[in-house]
Design a protein with these regions (language model features):
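N-terminal low-complexity or simple alpha-helical regulatory segments
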Residues: 1-67
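Generic structural motif
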Residues: 43, 54-59, 77-79, 123-127, ...
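Alpha-helical bundle regulatory/interaction domains
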Residues: 83-212, 216, 224, 233, ...
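Flexible coil/turn residues that form the inter-helical turn or adjacent wing/linker of helix-turn-helix
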Residues: 229
Length: 245
């Protein structure tokens, strides 16, 4: 049985998250004053494609995340913040991708309250036990992606290559369709491209420690509490006992 068999089980989420079948897709929806949805397509046992449309600042975390899942996350719009197993925070913004097997430790946060993205979930254990014929024929290797991006120890964060972005745009156009065959082909092609693209390092630091994030959030609260008050960098640095930079 796949590690993802319960990954999107509604019983593992708060009551305001519902899961229902919708044609050839499964839709997970967050109801309430703020909302969002994940539209999920099963490509093969152990391979799931998700179209994410989030209109809230916080998306709930499942009670327990599934083990040994390779997650490829591509941001189209907005920004996502997530706490990782190693105590660091990762920030994924428009035009960037994240690839790895690290587990999220807290709710996913979306500061702007708007996020659009595409995700691919690959169960490494299941795909090793029961390989996906399309991956085999197309020479797509999840293990090869892990090795190429060095994600066995750390989440890979970097710009989405232009050729990958083109495929993401094609996939996004099909987000509300039921063209599962085409979704499978485009997903396999996308993975093939990711595995073979030269590594690019973003000039922007995208990892932060929990203390850095706490300081940033508290600083935001101070600045927004009374916009008529001016606070200098020196004042805030002294308050948190850190350098102005």
């Amino acid at each position: 049985m796949s590690n993802m068999s319960q990954l999107f089980d509604a019983s593992r989420f708060p009551d305001d998250v519902k899961v229902r079948a919708n044609g050839k897709a499964t839709v997970m929806t967050l109801y309430g004053s703020e909302n969002g949805s994940l539209r999920l397509f099963s490509l093969w046992e152990g391979a799931i494609l998700s179209f994410n449309r989030i209109y809230t600042q916080v998306w709930p975390l499942a009670q327990n995340e599934a083990a040994n899942i390779l997650l490829l996350n591509f941001c189209r719009k907005g920004r996502c913040e997530v706490a990782l197993e190693d105590g660091q925070f990762a920030f994924l913004s428009q035009g960037h991708m994240a690839v790895g097997t690290q587990q999220a430790q807290e709710e996913y946060r979306y500061p702007s309250g708007l996020y659009e993205g595409v995700e691919l979930f690959l169960d490494l254990d299941m795909l090793a036990h029961r390989p996906y014929p399309l991956f085999q024929e197309g020479e797509v290797s999840p293990e090869g992606i892990v090795e190429h991006l060095h994600t066995s120890r750390r989440l890979y964060l970097g710009p989405t290559p232009a050729c990958v972005q083109t495929l993401l745009d094609d996939l996004w156009q099909l987000r509300d369709s039921e063209e599962v065959g085409l979704l499978k082909l485009l997903s396999a092609q996308l993975l093939w491209k990711v595995e073979r693209q030269p590594l690019e390092t973003s000039p922007t630091v995208r990892y932060f420690t929990s203390s850095q994030v706490s300081i940033a959030r508290e600083t935001r609260n101070i600045l927004c509490a009374d916009l008529s008050q001016n606070h200098t960098a020196r004042e805030l640095a002294d308050r948190f006992q850190v350098a102005e930079t």
